[in-house]
C-alpha cells in the first residue's frame, strides 16, 4: 500500500510551550507501571507530534527510549510502525500509517523527534493530595481561618519507582565545601498543590551532606500563569528518599546514565539565583 506524503505530518509541539495534559501523563505513568524497565534504558524523547494526514493536528504524546550513543541510529531507523508502537497506549492510528515500511512520512517524523527535548526517562511525580475529612459540626463559634497560602503545608515528592535507602556502593569522597551541582538536563515532576497539579522542572541539586542523602532542590515552578523560582528543602527524613551512593542521582538510574547526564560544578546561571549553603 502506498501513502502520499503529507507536508503537515511531523509538526512538533514543544513540550515546554504545550506541556502534556493530565490524561497524557496518566497514560505515560500507566505505561511505566506495565513496563517498569524499558528495553532501552537511557534518555527519552517526549513531546507531541502530528502524524495524521490532512493537517488535522491530532495530538500524540510519546516517549522514545534510547541511549545517547544509540539515539542517532535509533532515530535513523525509526519507522511509522515502531513509532505507532510507542504511542499505541495513547490513541489509535490510521492503519494506513503503518502499512508501508519505510513509511513516506518517516523523514518528517524523524525531524520532529529531533526537535523534541531530551529528558531522563524516569518520571517523578507527587500523588494527589487526599481530601481532608469534613469538620465536625461546630458546638461554639469559631474564628475564621486565614485563606490558603501559596503552599500551606510542605509538599511531598515520591519516586515513581521507590528505591532503597541504603546502597552497597562505597561512600563518595567529597570536598569540605559542597558546590551547587547544576544539571544540563531537566527532570519532569508533577507536584500537587492547593491549586492543582502543575508541571515543574528540576534545575539543580545542592548537596547538604557528604553522604548525598540530603539535598536542597531548586525547582522552576509555573503557577498562576507566571514563572516563579522556588527553593524547597527535600530531605531523606521529611520528603524524598535518595539512595546513598557516589552518584548524585538516585541509584535507580544506572551508573552509565549518571555519567552521560554530565553533571557539572559550573557557576550558577544568573537567573537561577541558587541559595548558598553555609
Curated annotation (Swiss-Prot):
Residues 164-174 have a biased composition (Low complexity). Residues 127-151 have a biased composition (Pro residues). Residues 127-174 are annotated as: Disordered. This is Uncharacterized ORF2 protein. It comes from Botrytis virus X (isolate Botrytis cinerea/New Zealand/Howitt/2006). The gene is ORF2.
